[in-house]
Amino acid sequence: MADNTVILDGSGVKRALTRIAHEVLEKNKGVEGLVLVGIRTGGVFLAQELAERLVEIEGVEVPCGAVDITMYRDDIKGHAEHLPVGKTELPFSIEGKKVVLVDDVLFTGRTIRAAMDALMDQGRASCIQLAVLVDRGHRDLPIRADFVGRNVPTSRSENIVVAFDAGNKPTEVILQK
């Protein structure tokens, strides 16, 4: 049986997202030209939560979309026809926008690389910034998050899970040993 440790409870997750929202606003000097794009699936829910925090702070809605990376992954050669493909939903152009790419856990960097490739196929953003709830280290690629909720050094055999409730609200972050 796996040994589970709660790293962040619900209120800890909320505080981390609120802090990330403030950091995003500070770095970008407000919300002008800003869009949020979550990586399916957990990143989408966190992007929506981040958008809610930005409304609470600034009183302005920031466009929020979703990107599916299935066809951009580097580990599917020869298996692509067997993978379920989600939908990229960007109800706005990213052309010239400041894109904040959102994911739940940053590990090797391969998911982020795939997401950036998918975004670049959608247009030329003025910049892409990365916000993650948890950074657990162990990069295979030179990827670094601009905004991090919590750094949690792990071994490669451990796992980090962000749990969501039925309404897709993050409830806790769990370290599985």
UniProtKB/Swiss-Prot annotation:
The keyword Nucleotidyltransferase belongs to this UniProt entry's keyword annotation: no
Keyword set, alphabetical order: Glycosyltransferase, Transcription, Transcription regulation, Transferase
Motif (PRPP-binding): 99-111
Molecular function terms, GO-annotated: uracil phosphoribosyltransferase activity
InterPro entries per the UniProt record, alphabetical: PRibTrfase_dom, PRTase-like, PyrR, PyrR_bifunctional
One Pfam match: Pribosyltran
Keyword Cytoplasm attached: no
Gene3D superfamilies listed in its UniProt record: 3.40.50.2020
E.C. number(s) listed in UniProt: 2.4.2.9
PANTHER family per the UniProt record, alphabetical: BIFUNCTIONAL PROTEIN PYRR (PTHR11608:SF0)
Entry function: Regulates the transcription of the pyrimidine nucleotide (pyr) operon in response to exogenous pyrimidines.
Protein family: Belongs to the purine/pyrimidine phosphoribosyltransferase family. PyrR subfamily.
Protein name: Bifunctional protein PyrR
